[in-house]
A protein has these predicted regions:
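Cysteine-centered catalytic environments shared across enzyme families
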Residues: 1-295
């Protein structure tokens, strides 16, 4: 768990307030106690708090591409990063760290905004193309990692937690009555709404695109969907009998658990007392070939 935050001047000209970025980062220190990093460029300011899991010694963020024209800050993990890294290196990309997040800058170089279809993991990230003036805020398919944003005048602020938005000094902690009504009625909020006025969550499976203007005017943030659930049509029949489907599920599930055990630090399990967490931990122990410590 890391923390990301930042600001985007929609006019694309002003340098970010460094003290503001430091306040936003300080509000996220509990998410990333190991390190911090910042980026300041005309129109764009990034702040990152790091919890080291992969690439312990050289994974400071922001992470840049080879010529430092693309930069990224990320909270999350990419489970198939060794395979993606090998594919990108075969295409000529040069990596400078062992961090799994570095695949983002090279995937962007290779595929542009189609990079999302090549990601397998849980993540929230901010990427800037300094040459083209394009900023992308992306969130994983089902919204495991949080990402909130707010437009205040001609500036967009974003962060892993709303408290960091408020720490910027530009976002007021005013309650949204409808958001509170949803929270107290359903014990949850819709994918976009929050309990604060003017603050929204980036929806799962979406990314926010901001193209900074080259001349006058203001950029218009555009939210785009890159993924959705693919449900079968009514009446469709599954291929195979129950035993075949059970074997197929077990194979997919074991692979999903296996790739989530990759880390440069010890991996443990957290048991809630239910069947699902026990099943995950038992599968982890089986695929790892050893007991997995649990709490």
């Amino acid at each position: 768990m890391c923390g990301i935050a930042g600001s985007i001047d929609l006019a694309g000209k002003r340098l970010p307030d460094r003290a503001m970025l430091q306040r936003m980062a300080a509000a996220l220190v509990h998410r990333g106690p190991d390190d911090s990093g910042f980026l300041s460029a005309p129109g764009v300011g990034f702040a990152h708090r790091r919890l080291s899991i992969v690439g312990l010694l050289d994974g400071r963020q922001p992470i840049y591409n080879e010529d430092r024209t693309v930069a990224v800050i990320c909270n999350g993990e990419f489970f198939d990063h060794p395979e993606r890294r090998a594919e990108l290196e075969a295409k000529g990309h040069v990596f400078s760290t062992h961090s799994d997040s570095e695949i983002l800058v090279h995937l962007y170089e290779e595929y542009g905004e189609e990079l999302f279809s090549h990601l397998k993991g849980q993540f929230a990230f901010a990427l800037v193309d300094l040459t083209r003036g394009i900023v992308l805020l992306g969130r994983d398919r089902v919204g495991i990692c949080p990402l909130f944003w707010s437009r205040q005048g001609d500036t967009v602020y974003f962060a892993s937690e709303i408290k960091a938005l408020i720490a910027s000094g530009a976002v007021r902690p005013d309650a949204d009555p409808r958001g509170l009504d949803h929270l107290f009625t359903f014990f949850a909020l819709s994918s976009r709404r929050t309990a604060f006025k003017g603050v929204q969550a980036l929806e799962p499976g979406h990314y926010l695109r901001i193209e900074l203007p080259q001349g006058r005017g203001l950029a218009s943030p555009v939210e785009r969907k890159y993924w959705d659930f693919d449900f079968p049509d009514w009446g469709d029949e599954l291929d195979g009998d129950v035993e075949q489907l059970t074997d197929s599920f077990q194979s997919v599930f074991e692979r999903a658990v296996d790739i989530r055990l990759r880390a440069d630090v010890p991996v443990v399990g957290y048991l809630s007392g239910g069947v699902d967490s026990a099943f995950v931990l038992a599968t982890a122990a089986r695929v790892a070939g050893r007991p997995v410590p649990s709490f």
